[in-house]
């Protein structure tokens, strides 16, 4: 009977340790997908005509002529749903991208494809420019500790407690 109580106590300790570790590091391993990456590619040649990463929550427009192709991109985060359209006429492509996007959204018109990915990107901190000096924000640049490190530490301490409880 006494051994059963000890084994139940050990299981409760393990359960509490694992749940505590998961609770404490839940914000560490959750990635924030804060950026949109738009890639315009010529499918027949494999050439990337245009690639840009920009914040997911900000409207964005760009117009460029690259290798005879006119690329006109408009992004508006205020419209919900995965909607983007391609309009083509005489090597002029207009991409209207809006709303919440999924991984690898893809639209093709002729040989030109637009690939839109939602990614995590570390944008540089904003800088304040004055006449003679440049100052930058003092935000932290430390990377989060990986989940595997937390799990390894939890396993190590669990093993230590297990060994101590045997003696």
UniProtKB/Swiss-Prot annotation:
Its main location: membrane. One of its GO terms (cellular component) is plasma membrane. It is found in: Cell membrane. The chain crosses the membrane at residues 11-31, 143-162. It comes from the Archaea. Keywords: Cell membrane, Membrane, Transmembrane, Transmembrane helix. It is a multi-pass membrane protein. This is Uncharacterized protein MJ1161. It comes from Methanocaldococcus jannaschii (strain ATCC 43067 / DSM 2661 / JAL-1 / JCM 10045 / NBRC 100440) (Methanococcus jannaschii).
